[in-house]
């Protein structure tokens, strides 16, 4: 994407990304059985601190109860009823694997649905229901904090951020505004300035929230940013969300001046993010994308996933090819807002951020099989989570593994070695 992206959609290029990507195989580590693992984390903490990292934010949603594949929009379009599936063997079976009512992913207790609250009660509920599957648990964040900060004079602050999980354009745009407000809060609370860095690790569609935030951070995005902020302010006023209007009023002047972080730098790592929105790197420090990926293709294009029907319907139940949520939750898919006001505002945001709509366009985007966006570095990782089990709770179609406790050392090592220089 151009340096000044201005909310353009990613071009979803299938070209070889070359030196932008590396390939790794995971080595799980259980800290309770490995003092050397704790020592390694402490060394990584020193390297992070040396490079100015003062805050690490662990941003996530919930795989449960949120239409993680975004089939509501595809069903609303009625692709199967309108004959788009004629001649495409296995398409109805694929949609059944993606659909909430038939994919085996449980609902949240009490029918809890997005927007999810970023509060202790909801976080505890997720920890109880889904554990460390696509979820940065309190245990994970606390262990990260303790292990990184051993021996540091200035501790690195570790923060857990649960986004609303509204898997549509409006929800992600509102979450981007909230996140920018929080970034400002943290910059002030921890007295960050020139030379300091905030590192955000974003799982799944939380990465798309950060992609929108990167466009809002760009000093050059004036007209589109104003248009989007005005749209969101009007919607927030309509539904009595004064927190959104207040945040926009507070951050808009700072965004225009490039002063939101008070001179600090924002680094972003995405974990299993579907490729949709384009990134604007001009307001970021570093950008890295990590994807659970196993090479199944026969054409030598090792950097692409495999999306062949009907074969995918046999590969997906055991997560054979890696992360299928990352692969399939692309343009055209989405949850659907529940109110008329939400639907109208979502359509207006849609027109700014994503030119694709329609069942056939979704299928076209999915078949592009792109693992990485056009901006940033990438790591393709075989996380070894395909064991032959068809129990979705074991792998959640390859989307759960990034936040597992036994992956903390591996992920942190890869992130630090890729983004931050040795002392």
Language model regions located:
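Proline/glycine-enriched tight loop/beta-turn segments at coil->beta junctions
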Residues: 49-53
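Noncatalytic linker/hinge segments flanking ATPase motor cores
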Residues: 96-106, 201-205, 241-243, 309-318, ...
